[in-house]
Amino acid sequence: ALPISAQAEQILTWTDGAPNRGTRVEATIWLGDQLAERTDGALKIDYHWGGALMNFKAATKGIGSGAADMGLMVGAYNPTLHPGYLLADLPMPYSDPWVGNRAIYDLVQNNADLQAEFHKLNLQYITNITTTQIELICKDKTVKSLEDIKGLKVRGTGVYMKVFGDLGSTPVNMSSAEAYQGISTGLLDCTQIYGYAIPAFKLEEVANEVTKLDWGALMGMAFVMNKDVYDALPEDQKKTLNQLGSDFIDHYAEKIMAGNAKAYENIAAGKDGNKVNISDLPDAEKAKLVEASAPYIDEWRAAAKASGLDADGIYDQYIALLKKYDDERKAKGYPWR
């Protein structure tokens, strides 16, 4: 065998629907830097941002068919392809980003049904990302209880928007990028959002009340690799990639949680001249939010069972993993501290 330094370098094309900016993108580039470093330059990633190769909807089949070697796959764009994995997008009683992302990573790596779901698409699951907890930012409206949501025009995502609708809000369908204009023109009272995304979309310029719901997160977003490309890698490179996928969970959580903390610090202090009040939804109200999500968990179970998955087994394993990592966090703190 040739010494490692003499192995031909392999360039892996990466498709990403998102523009090249922000914490998640920085962490994605870290993954590529680490892969090159840990394989002594044998594996390198060539990134294509902003949907330049293919958009988010096309990425799942595109990576599976070899139009790209790797990339970010967002489950919500193709729900029928990922009935099991979409459990990751549902509200859970645990909202810590490290806990959630570590649990879903472990679940996919160790659950035969979920492995098969990815393999059927000719994809190898590498690692996972999370939006972090869903919070609420409003203009001139303070939300102290779920009662206060009634009648408010709110933009949201997936099941989280549906639950708000069930609780009496008026759901408004628009993207998070349109929320700024929606709030400034009065089409919206509030938008569901993640901490780091508030300054990213400059929402503190048009809204002044944040209620921390700390409610679930969207985690049905995976870094995947074409399975044929993965299978053709030498064993040592597979091992390196698998270890890196696990290390990424910690690295990403550390960076994204720091991004959230900094965003809140800046908007609370009015760093850019726009001060925002930040309050927490009381625990009893948070519990009601989780309760209101139950019908959608049942809906997920039915869809997963219909596609031949052991839905109860997947769900129970996921809850057990969430509890395991939450207990670990409480006992030992985060791995990077």
Regions inferred by a protein language model and the residue ranges of each:
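N-terminal secretory/targeting leader peptides
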Residues: A8-N101, D113-R337
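Core domains of carbohydrate- and sulfate-ester-processing enzymes
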Residues: V108-A112
